[in-house]
Amino acid sequence: IQDGVIVNYYESVQLVTRLKAELEERLGVELPYAAAAIPPGVSEGSVKSIGYVLEGAGFEVTNIVDEPTAAAAVLKITDGAVVDVGGGTTGISILKDGKVIYTDDEATGGSHMTMTVAGHYRIPYEEAEVLKTTPEKEKEIFPVIKATVEKMASITEKFLKGYEIPAVYVVGGSASFQEFTSVFEKKLNLPVYRPVHPLLVTPLGIAYNCQLPQKAH
């Protein structure tokens, strides 16, 4: 998977099948249903590919929703913008009166932060990812990736043009840095909020949107 899009169908099916089996064994229950989330704006073919992967792994697919909208379901937002900073993209959903009125995304995400860290310290990507996600290193790392965060804020500013919103909510693991919201607030001149565990919001939103068939209740 690259930037939320399937690039190797066979390996993706194998991976999801293995994870499904491991989780079923750990929980002691069968998991017949699945939902998924996609970056906003991906092609219809990419959406279908994600569904095919889940079906290939033995799931019945109940729903596929865009990532920021999944997050909004958890945050219970009716008016505002949800910005989901994923591994490869920064996506947005704008909501008004509880309805999504705009979605979009652009290819700048956590992987770009990691590449910046790798280049700065001249270390392998995998080592840079560990360094980036080590809480004790946050004060050292954030100045290195601040320009990337500012780019994410600029992307969000572009998405918001023409819309009046009361606040922005940021989710995704890359939003975990303590100074992340202050960079966004400075650029957007809007209140910016981050939940306690931003990494977990979108996955929980996918589960909320699973829409189990009536027979499963």
Task: State each model region's role.
Residues I1-V85, D97-H217:
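Nucleotide/phosphate-binding catalytic cleft detector across ATP-hydrolyzing
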Residues T90-I94:
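Short beta-strand scaffold segments in enzyme catalytic cores
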